[in-house]
Amino acid sequence: MSPQCFICSLLCWKLQTSLQHPETRKRGWIKERILKMASMFRSEEMYLRQLFLQVESAYCCVAELGELGLVQFRDLNANVNNFQRRFVNEVRRCESLERVLRFLESEMGEEILPVISGKYPETPPPREMIDLETVLEKLEGELEEANQNLQALKQNFLELTELKHLLKKTQDFFETETNLPDDFFSEDTSGLLELRSTPAAVAAKLGFIAGVIKRERLVPFERLLWRACRGNIYLKFSEMDTPLEDPITKEEMKKNVFIIFYQGEQLRQKIKKICDGFRATVYPCSESAGERREVAAGVNTRIEDLNTVITQTESHRQGLLKEASANLWAWGIKVRKMKAIYHILNSCNIDVTQQCVIAEIWFPVVDILRIKRALNQGMERSGSTISPILTAIQTKLDPPTFNRTNKFTAGFQAIVDAYGVGNYREINPAPFTIITFPFLFAVMFGDCGHGAVMLGFALWMISNEKSFLAQKSKNEIWNIFFGGRYLILLMSIFSIYTGFIYNDCFSKSFNIFGSSWRVRPMYNNGVWTDEIVHDNGFLQLNPKTRGVYSGNPYPFGIDPIWNIAINKLTFLNSYKMKMSVIIGITHMVFGVVLSLFNHIYFKQTTNIVLQFIPEMIFIISLFGYLVFMIIFKWCRFNVNNVQNAPSILIHFINMFMFSYDDSTNRPLYEHQQEVQTFLVIFALIAIPWMLLIQPFIIRAKHQKAQDKLASSSLSESPTGDIEVEIMDSNHSEKTNQEVDSSGGHGGHDHGEFNFGDICVHQAIHTIEYCLGCISNTASYLRLWALSLAHAQLSEVLWTLLFSQGFKMTGWIGLIGIFVLFTVFAALTIAILLIMEGLSAFLHALRLHWVEFQNKFYSGSGCSFAPFSFKTIIERNEE
C-alpha cells in the first residue's frame, strides 16, 4: 500500500521542483498538463491579480467569468453597508423580479410544471432587465386581476349556493310544520322549545331569521341563543348535503342551514348580534311560498351563469400560467445570474473618474489563459474597445486552497475537507485516501458476500447516475449515499478482496485450491484409531505427523479448514491483531514521510532536521521495531521449533524496562539486548531533539533579523530608498509569485515574537507526537476488533437462523427455508451492511483524520470559492 503512495509523492515533488527551473517556464500545453498532474497531490497554485474593467464592459466581463467559474472575487467594500453600495438598486430590482417569479410558481402549484430545458440560458445583457420587468409586471397584473375576479365570482357562487340550499330547506320546513301552540312563548320555558302543533294564527304573528353557519360552530351557537333569549325562540336546522369550498383558502367547508322563530324586535336584535358573532351568514327569506319559489328559480339561473363565467375566468387564468410556465425556468436563471453579477460588482471599487471598475481576484495559475480569453469575450460582447487589464499585486494574505476534482474524486476530497480545508499548497491527502480509506474499511468489513451486495448497490447507482442527477432529489440521506457512490464502489471491491484474504463469504469459506491439511495420514501413522475418534469430541491435527500438512500454505488467503476448527477464533485473533499493528504503523510512517515533502516544498530546512528526522527516529526505533519483530517471528519459527518461540509482547515490554533476565522468554536473535538498548536510547534522544533545539534556533533567527533591521535603519538614505523602490518595481512579478507560492506558511514571522509561546507550542507538539504514537498504534487495533465482530455476527446469523432451514424436510422445509432466508436477508442488510458498514466507515474516517492526517496535514486553510453561475443555480435549486 504505502510504497506506491510513496513513489507517487516522490514523483509529485520531483515534478514541482523541476517546474521552478527556468527551462520549464515555457508556454504550451505540456506545462499545463504537468501542472494539472502535479496538482493532484497539492492544491492549485493561485495568483492574486488586480483587474481593471471599463464600466461599460464590467457587466459582460463578470458574466463571462461567472460562466467559467474559475475566479474568486475579494470584497473590497467589506466596511461599506450593503444599502450604500453602487449597484444596490439593480440588486433590489432583481429581488423584485424574484418575488414575481415566486408568486407565479406558487400559483402554478403542482398542476402546471415549468418547462426545463437541458441547457442554461445565456446571461442577459443589462438592458434586458427592463424588458423582463415589463413582461413580468404585466403578467403579474393580469394574474392578480384574474385571481381577484375569480375569487369574487367564487364568493358570489358560494353565497348563491348557500341561498339555494337555504330556500330549499326553508320551503321543506314550512311545508311540514304549519302550526304552533298558543302558549309557545312563556317565561317558564326550561329549554329550547321543540316543535309542537299550534294554530296557524299564532305562527303568522312570529318573525323568523334564516341563515347558514359552519357545522362545528352550531353547538355553541345553539347554546348561546338559548341562554341569551331565555328559551323564547324556536330553532330549526338542517345539514347541507354537499360540502362547499372556501374561495380564499380553497378548503372544504361543511355548513348547516338554520331558521330561528322569534317574537319581538328586541329578540330579533339579539339574534342578529349572535349571528354576527358566530360569523353566520343571514339571508333574506320571504314568508310567501310563491316568492320563495321565484327567488329559488332566479338563484338557479344565476348559478348557471356564474358557472359559465367561472369556467371562462379559470380558463383565462390557466392560459396565463401556461404562458408563464414556458419561460419561468429560463427567467429564473436569468434573474439569478443578473443578481449574482451585481453582487460581484458591489464588491468592486470604482475609480474617481467613475469610468473604471477595480476588482481583486484569485484564480489558478494554470487557467490564466482561459480567464484572459473570457475577459476578451466579455469585452467584445459589450462592444467596448478597451481591453481588461490584469496586474500583479503584492499581498500577505493566505491564498485560498483549490483542489480540482471530478465525479470520482469529489467524494474522497469531501472526506478530507470535512476534517479541515488544507493550507495553501500543502500535501493533499485525498489521492492517497482513494486507496487507503476503502482498504482500511475493507479490513474491518471483509466479507465476499457482503461486499458483493454492496458492489451491486454501487453499480446500480453508477449505471443510473444520469437519471438520478436529473431528478434532483431533496432526500438528504439518499443524496449522501449517491454522492459517495464511487466511494461505496471501491469499498465494496476492497471488501471482496479482503473477504478472499479472510476466506469468508457469509461466514463460510471457499475451498478453491484444496486444503493443505489432510486427515488420512493421522490414521495411517497410527495416531488416530476408531476408538480415539469415537471417544473424543475434539481432535487435533498434528502438523509434525508426516503427510498431515503439505508444507505449502493455501495459495491465496486463509486455508478453508480453519472454518471448521474449534480454535479458529484463537488463530484469527492473533493473525488480525498483528496485521492491524503492521498496517497501522505503516500508515502512520507514511504520514510522517509525507510531511517531509511539505518541508521540502516550503523550503523549511529547519523542520526537516529538527522535526522530521527525530519523528522518524522515534517511531521507527520503537514501533517500526515492533513490526520487525512480528515479521521476523513469522519467518523464523515453524512447526519444528514452535516450542521455542518467544512472546513478542513480553519482549517489547522488557525493552522499555531494560529487563533481560527472563529465562522463560528466549531471545529472538543474537545481540537482541544490544540492539534494543540502542533503539530505546536513540528514541529517547529524539525527544529533546524535537523539544529543545527548534525554539532557540527560531529565537536566534529572529534576533539576527532584528539586528539587520536596526543596522539598515541607521544607514538608511534617500538614494537607498529610490534604489529599493526601483528594484521592487522591476521585480514585482517575481515577488508576487514568491508570495503566492509561499502562501501563509511564513505569516507567523510577521507577528510579535514571543519566545515563551514558541516553547509552549513546541512542547505541546512533542508531547502530542510521542504520546500519539502510542495511542494511535493502539487505535489501529480497531481494525482487528471490528473485523472480528463482523465475522462473528455473520456466523451467528447463519448458524442460528438460516442454517435451521436446512434441517427441515418436506413442504415445511420448503416454506421454512423461504421464510428464514427472507429474515436472514433482511437482518443481513439491516445489521451487517447498514449498521456494521456505517460503523466501519466511521472508524476508517477516524483513522484517517486523527492517526494519519495529523502527521502532515494542518487543515487550517480557506477553501477556494469561485464565482460560478452553475454553483449559484444549483444551490438555489436545493
Kindly label every feature range from the protein language model.
Residues Q4, Q16, Q20-H21:
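Low-complexity, intrinsically disordered or signal/transmembrane-proximal segments
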Residues C5-C8, C12:
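Cysteine-centered motifs
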Residues R33-T433, F437, C448, F468, ...:
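Long, charged N-terminal accessory/stalk domains
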Residues A38-Y47, Q54-L70, P220, A330, ...:
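Conserved, carboxylate-rich catalytic/transport cores that coordinate ions
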